[in-house]
């Protein structure tokens, strides 16, 4: 008889407010490109020590064996930015929301291992363990496991719930907050999604950000957009919102986020001072250099890049958009892509009929995503099999409820636009 993956007890972790999201980096050269590979800090002697002694071939073999024994009871989700050795074991590959949504539609799994970062595992837990779904499983929760709880997101960490609540209170001294819609990028903590749910706000993805802002502006005069200023600015700019009607809120400046009352009153979009550390590495001069060296190249970037980069590019869109553009392009098309290196290199390998380049000559890959390695994946799977899961991400009921409210508003907006 198969062992149930629903444990008598489990080790549940909450990421501390000051969680560490950076690691040391080792530089090496791939062709003409200098690459900085984040290096996991040495682990103290502990549960992973024996796994660290194994090479990748041995780890992959053990992962395959435990997967075969667990069968459909466990679902492995792999984000596009994962390293190839990890993504090879994923049942589903995609962006953060796409993976969580797909997982919520599965009815046969007892546990999910999310090879991504902390906020992604939170979103999966929220969507997979909604009350009606738990009821449909006779009260059983699906454990969502993050192989390494140190896999956070520096951008998500740039907007703590306490900072957002303080900003909201400060804005209320100048502007009627009933006339502000809070919008959080899905790349954020569950507490921020819940904040938006409570305050009439909404979640967005990089795919539907424009539709979400259109919805928000139909309801209120202003938007507070967090945590990624670049996605907010690029989206608002594409909608024709003048730059002088956008301001940046610095959560570390106690003086109205570094603004005065007049600036806030004339602003339609209040952008949180946050950014993706990977996409911030791409610079306008990278676009110029690529066009000089490769005439006819198409520049394709993610909207988390700075506006100056997006405006110089030919195309900008979400991870799924980038993949779809490459898949639909004619053989022989030349591309320079500005997004996370693992994805770009994978596209290059999967589409040898096209000439795909990485936009930047030097980049640091997503350090925290890189923490999910074969050792952590094997360790977490074998603990699931033993009935003693580790690193279970569990969002509290109230936060999950209000997060779902904000997420469902997003789904309604997207469905209306597509209908």
Feature-to-residue mapping (PLM):
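Active-site loop-to-helix "anion-binding N-cap" substructures in soluble metabolic enzymes
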Residues: 2-337, 343-419
């Amino acid at each position: 008889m198969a062992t149930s993956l629903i444990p008598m007890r489990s080790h549940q972790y909450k990421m501390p407010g000051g969680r560490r999201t950076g690691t040391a980096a080792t530089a090496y050269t791939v062709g003409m490109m200098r690459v900085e590979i984040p290096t996991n800090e040495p682990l103290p002697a502990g549960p992973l020590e024996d796994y660290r002694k194994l090479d990748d071939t041995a780890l992959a073999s053990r992962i395959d064996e435990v997967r075969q024994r667990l069968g459909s009871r466990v679902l492995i989700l792999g984000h596009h930015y994962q390293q190839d050795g990890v993504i090879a074991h994923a049942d589903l590959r995609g962006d953060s929301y796409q993976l969580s949504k797909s997982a919520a539609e599965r009815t046969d799994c007892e546990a999910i291992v999310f090879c991504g970062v902390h906020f992604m595992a939170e979103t999966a837990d929220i969507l997979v363990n909604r009350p009606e779904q738990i009821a449909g499983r006779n009260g059983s929760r699906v454990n969502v496991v993050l192989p390494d709880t140190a896999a956070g997101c520096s951008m998500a960490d740039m907007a703590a719930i306490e900072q957002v609540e303080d900003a909201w209170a400060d804005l209320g001294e100048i502007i009627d907050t009933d006339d502000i819609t809070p919008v959080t990028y899905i790349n954020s903590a569950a507490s921020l999604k819940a904040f938006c749910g409570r305050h009439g706000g909404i979640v967005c993805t990089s795919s539907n950000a424009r539709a979400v802002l259109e919805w928000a502006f139909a309801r209120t005069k202003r938007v507070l957009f967090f945590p990624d200023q670049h996605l907010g600015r690029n989206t608002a700019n594409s909608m024709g919102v003048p730059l002088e009607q956008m301001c940046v809120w610095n959560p570390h400046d106690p003086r109205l986020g570094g603004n005065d009352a007049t600036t806030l009153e004339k602003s339609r979009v209040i952008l949180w001072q946050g950014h993706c550390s990977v996409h911030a590495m791409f610079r306008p001069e990278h676009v110029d250099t690529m066009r000089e060296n490769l005439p006819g190249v198409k520049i394709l970037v993610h909207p988390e890049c700075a506006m100056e980069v997006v405006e110089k590019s030919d195309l900008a869109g979400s991870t799924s958009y980038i993949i779809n553009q490459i898949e639909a392009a004619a053989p022989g098309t030349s591309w320079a892509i500005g997004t996370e290196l693992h994805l770009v290199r994978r596209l290059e390998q999967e589409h040898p009929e096209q000439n795909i380049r990485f936009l930047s000559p030097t980049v640091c890959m997503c350090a925290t995503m890189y923490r999910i390695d074969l050792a952590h994946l094997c360790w977490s799977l074998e603990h699931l099999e033993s009935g003693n899961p580790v690193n279970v991400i569990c969002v509290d009921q109230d936060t999950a409820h209000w997060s779902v409210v904000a997420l469902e508003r997003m789904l309604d907006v997207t469905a209306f636009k597509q209908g």
